[in-house]
Design a protein with these regions (language model features):
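Non-catalytic, surface beta->alpha helical segment in thiol-disulfide oxidoreductase systems
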Residues: 81, 436-440, 446-471
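Short active-site neighborhood of thiol/selenol oxidoreductases, capturing the structured segment around
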Residues: 350-379, 393-395
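A non-transmembrane, solvent-exposed segment enriched in polar/low-complexity residues
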Residues: 27-176, 183-187, 191-221, 225
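Short, internal strand/loop/helix patches
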Residues: 410-446
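N-terminal "domain-start" segment that seeds a small globular fold
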Residues: 314-352, 463-470
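Bacterial Sec-dependent N-terminal signal peptides
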Residues: 1-34, 453, 470-471
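Structured, charged N-terminal subsegments at the starts of enzyme catalytic cores
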Residues: 204-270, 278
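Structural microenvironment flanking redox-active thiols in thiol-disulfide oxidoreductases
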Residues: 373-413, 425-430
């Protein structure tokens, strides 16, 4: 029996490993020199965005002339980050021009040699920062000085805003393929047809139709054929809004949203985006043993994964995913749990279906598992306090392969609930039940249908409380 304490860092590392192959798109070699004013450090780090992450590209040592030089192959085109310690100093562009120099003086003025793409990028960033600074300054002056001439301050601000808007418009027109233009355009919402408006407001009688239209056309301004955008912070920001705010947080709705996204991306030469979003949500849900993650994983595999829609996944990999979904399917919420019949260390047999309480907690644990011991302590407190209040029974099975350790632990901790002895091999052979890690808990209703599945005791208590409060 594998004894595992869930660790989010391990999960993130696993995702990083799986996501890396998508970097094979849009890569290039670069030779970049950075000359950075009065930054007295010997080492800096160059990172880049990719989806929801920042990826370390290289650690650079200070050259004899005080500069830092990045010379590296296979860097994804997009936005790079110059980092000192834990502080991101500035961002820059990885694009077609691959040999250039970026100078930053003590007054934070940028001078770029040999790269118009970055020269334009810094020009745009400078104008953007100036208008944001003026906005903050204007609001602060109005707030701090009640006697300030608000009209005058607002007029000054509005004049500068109009100048910036003109600058933006000219920039987008002159440089339609610049990454800055593509990033800003990518975040634009779809235009609202007049049929959904009542004056300047959304017509409340057509609100549902409008929401459907908005979600359906949400990606219209995103250029899926431009793989640079996945290596910017803009893509994941937009994707997060699409999945978390424009999509109902039910398993089937999430799967449909992913399917729709992939179909749109595929139709517009955006297979890298399709791979990313599927990798992200498949891995997020398949590695976490919670009921809602398992439901989502099964729905995504059923609705999204297919040879036609996901051609980058081999037939054997698809078969593996489908088999994994089929293994999880019988243990999803509202499914009937298996009638387990096992013995105590003293040889007495207990059947799960003989328990007639309103709730049953089926708890798989191991005597040598430290996380299990924490859950056991919490369960014991909960059981003593709420056994009669909530009409709940605990049906626990120790899966430790070390019989002596199990005997010693149970003698030291004589629990009041049912404690049975088995092992993972026996459960697999008798019930086709795979318990891959402990602790593992299932909350069942009076008919032994699954309500929740989790490795965390507190979620069991929260679920029961929530049900009781609704009744």
């Amino acid at each position: 029996m594998m004894k595992v304490k869930l660790n989010s860092k391990i999960f993130l590392f696993l995702f990083f490993i799986v996501a890396l192959p998508t970097f094979l798109f849009s890569q290039q070699s670069y030779d970049i020199t950075f000359k950075i004013g009065e930054i007295y450090v010997d080492t800096v780090v160059i990172k880049s965005y990719y989806g929801n992450k920042t990826i370390v590209i290289d650690s650079l040592k200070r050259e004899k002339d005080g500069s830092f030089r990045l010379k590296k192959d296979n860097i994804h085109k997009g936005i790079g980050i110059f980092t000192v310690g834990k502080m991101d100093i500035f961002t820059f562009v990885f694009d077609k021009e691959n040999k250039f120099e970026i100078n930053l003086d003590d007054n934070w003025n940028y001078l770029v040699k040999g790269c118009q793409e970055n020269d334009l990028y810094f020009e745009f960033q400078k104008a953007n920062k100036q208008i944001r600074f003026l906005e903050s300054k204007t609001k602060r002056e109005i707030k701090q000085n009640p006697n300030a001439n608000k009209d005058s301050l607002n007029n000054i601000y509005n004049t500068e805003v109009n100048k910036f808007m003109s600058f933006q418009k000219e920039f987008y027109k002159s440089y339609p393929n610049h990454i800055m233009t593509k990033m800003v355009k990518a975040l634009e919402d779809p235009q609202i047809p007049k049929e959904y408006l009542n004056g300047n407001q959304i017509d409340t009688t057509k609100k549902l139709e409008f929401i459907y239209y908005f979600r359906t056309h949400y990606w219209d301004n995103f250029d899926f054929s431009d793989n640079r955008l996945i290596a910017t912070p803009y893509f994941f920001t937009k994707q997060k809004t699409y999945m978390n705010e424009l999509t109902m947080q039910t398993s089937d709705s999430i799967a449909v949203a992913i399917k729709d996204f992939i179909e749109k991306a595929n139709q517009n030469n955006g297979i890298e985006y399709s791979k990313y979003i599927l990798d992200y949500y498949i891995l997020m849900n398949r590695k976490l043993p919670f009921a809602y993650n398992e439901e989502r994983f099964v729905e995504i595999v059923d609705r999204v994964v297919s040879g036609e829609r996901t051609p980058w996944i081999s037939p054997s990999e698809i078969e593996t995913m489908k088999a994994e979904a089929d293994k999880i399917r019988p243990l999803l919420p509202e499914k009937q749990f298996i009638n387990i019949s096992e013995k105590t260390l003293n040889g007495k047999t207990y059947n799960l279906y003989d328990i007639k309480t309103k709730y049953t907690v089926v708890y798989f644990w191991s005597a040598g598992c430290e996380s299990c011991k924490i859950n056991l302590d919490q369960l014991e407190t909960f059981y003593k306090k709420y056994k009669r209040v909530y009409d709940v029974e605990i049906f626990s099975i120790d899966l430790d392969n070390n019989m002596e350790e199990s005997i010693a632990f149970q003698q030291k901790h004589p629990f009041d609930w049912i404690v049975l002895k088995s092992n993972s091999t026996q459960l697999k052979e008798k019930y086709n039940l795979d318990i891959e890690m402990t602790p593992d808990l299932y909350l069942l209703d009076k008919d032994k249908k699954i309500i929740n599945h989790t490795p965390l005791y507190n979620q069991i208590e929260e679920t029961i409380r929530s049900i009781e409060e609704e009744e």
